[in-house]
Every structure is written in C-alpha cells, then in structure tokens.
Amino acid sequence: MRTKAPRTSSPKSAPLQARSPRTPAANGSTNGSTNGHAKTNGHAKSNGAAAPAKRGASAAKTTSKSAAKSSSTQKPTTAKANSALRKASRGSLLTHETAHLFKAGAITTDSPIIYVNGRMVPKSQAMVSVYDHGLLYGDGVFEGIRIYNGQIFKCGQHMERLWRCAEMIRLRIPVSRDEMVQIMHDCVAANNIRDGYIRLVVTRGFGTLGLDPRKCPVAGVICIADQIALYSPEQYEKGMKIIVAKRPRTPIECLDPRLKSLNYLNNILAKVEAIDQGCDEAIMLNLDGFVGECTGDNLFIIQGGRVYTPPTESGILEGITRRFVMDLCADMGIPCLLKNMRPEEVKTADEVFLTGSAAEIIAVTQIDEIKIGSGLEGPVTRRLRQAFKAIVQGREIPQD
C-alpha cells in the first residue's frame, strides 16, 4: 500500500507592505520599465507602480494595427508562430517595438517570444531592471512546467505550488491564477510549441540596493516557453552516471525544501561537483546522512519489486512529477513506499531512476564507481518510463 508524505499547510502571512521608490526615474532598468507590469503601450508609469497586465478589452490597447501576413519566404512553423503572435497583439501584450520587429520578420531569428512584466517581447528585448531583487538577491519563486501536445501538464498543481511558495516568502503575485494560465497559453501559442517547457518566474520586483522587500512595490513576472533537453537520448536509453555530492542539502531549519525559490546556489555547487567528475547529476544528502534528492530531480530506487523514494522530511522538494510517478505506480500495481535511505542502500538497489518536469523519468546505471543492477535501465524503470510516455503523448494530458 502506497503511503504519502505528510503535508503541512502553507503560512498565511500577509504580503509585505511595499514602499514606492522615491526616485523611480533612476531605476537602472535595462528595458525602460520602472517596475515591470507596465501598460502595454510600451510606456511605464512614472510612479513605478504600474497595474498588473490584463487581457482583452480591459487591457490598454496597442496603437499599432495587426501585422501584415507573413511573407512566402518564411518557414511554415514561423508563419504559425506569427499568426499566434498576431493573436497575442490583439490581447495588448505586444509593445510597439515588438510589433515593428514582428513586421520586419526579426522574430524568425530572435525567438522565443517571452512575456516580461505585461509585454510580449523578442528574446533580445526580454530584460529586467538591474535593481530587480530577483537578480540582486535571488528573491523570488519559479516553476518549471512541461508542454505536451500543446497542453500544459499538471497546470493546476503547478499553479497551486507557485502561489503557495509566494505566500511562504510573503510575495504578492500581481496577476490572478487565471491570468497566469492565460499568459502561459499565449507564450506557447506565440512560439508555436507542441512539446516543450515553460519557465515561470516571479521576482520580488524593482527595488533599491538593500534587502528590504518593502522597497519593491510590484513583483515581476516572466514567462518563457521554449524547448529543453537536460539529457541526451543516449542517456535515456543507456542510463546515466551520477555521484554522491560531498556538499549536503541546506537544512530544513534554515530553508524549507518545499520552497522553490530563485536561489539554487546549494544545488549548483553540488552540480559543479558532478561536472568535475564527468557526471551530470549528484545525490545530495541531508545533515543526518540520509539521501534527499538530486540537484534538480527527485530520486527513486527499486528493491525486490518495490519502489522507494525519500519522504519530504528528508529535505526534498515535493516534485509534481514525483507525485505523478507515485500515483502511476499505484495504477500499475507497483508498491511505492516512502523511506529514509542511506547512500549505501541506494548504491545496492536493483534499479535507480530520477524524476523531474524537465527530466521526466531517467534511469541511473552508476553511482560513484558502483554499477547499479545490470548496468542498464531496469525492467521496472522501463515500464514506468514507457507508461509515462504513453500518457503524455496521448490526446488528453493530465492538467490538474
């Protein structure tokens, strides 16, 4: 019988009261916007506290007309993207500058089109202020989300986690959940993506030098829809080699592992350890020496036909793909249990695999110098990976 990790409620602390900057003109912004979420005519409000982006008739209208049809020299995929971009322009997300670049065909070499604080802009114009606290201090939260068959995988759960994480750091997201979902759909359509990846970022926003979050009037919102390939096709077929990092996970008492924040330095330094040893991933242990997770993926082992994964109390992120795979095990009649594990137990497992939004399911065939099982992707891992693929390649993608 599968057991679930206990869930704790998110803190309901009110967002911190923001103070408007006294000198908004000297904002250091690299895109001319004082706070993000500027009106969609491309001109930021002078008080540095513009309203959140809105769609349709309620949004500020662009003065430019819809761009002309794509020329016959453009590739079909580009023509489709242009059509989607015209649709976005009717929703007042395009700036004047972007509309002109769009007409000139610049987006054919300057993709993806990215949502930045109320505007859809080419990659070269997707900029934030150098005074944004997300850049200065890693103050913000994010989500990585998969797109399958043009649909957003587990959209509801990702939105729930994003808002929960924002509440944990007392950050007010300046758009509603429905508006955020629409932003994602607009980015997917503008870039003509059928299968890809969405990166949603919410920063504390433009502020001043210094940690005080009250100096940031409005949070920043960025949405990128693009392709992603963390690992090679060969690694998915043959499995990957990983290490056990010497650097432990940040203790739960210092930073709640459920918080998907912009500060990933602990993970990055463990990743550097792996790279130095010719590997792409590393297992991170908690201070008690138990296995937590990898730098960007959750970890599972298979022993005696049973699947095990560390509980959230071991200091891991509650991965959405992790939860989906646990439910998939139950549907397939494979026992899946939560268990604290030492690295030695993982190294002697029959099979090991990792899960993540970007990684999906990938086998681990070697840890440090120890071969896992036969040294090939194991039969249970293969069954789960194939079942996962069958679901996400189907017509109806799980969205809640």
Q: Model-predicted segments: where are they?
A:
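Secondary-structure junction motif
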Residues: 321-322
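Glycine- and Gly-Pro-enriched alpha-helical subdomains that act as flexible
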Residues: 283-286, 290-312
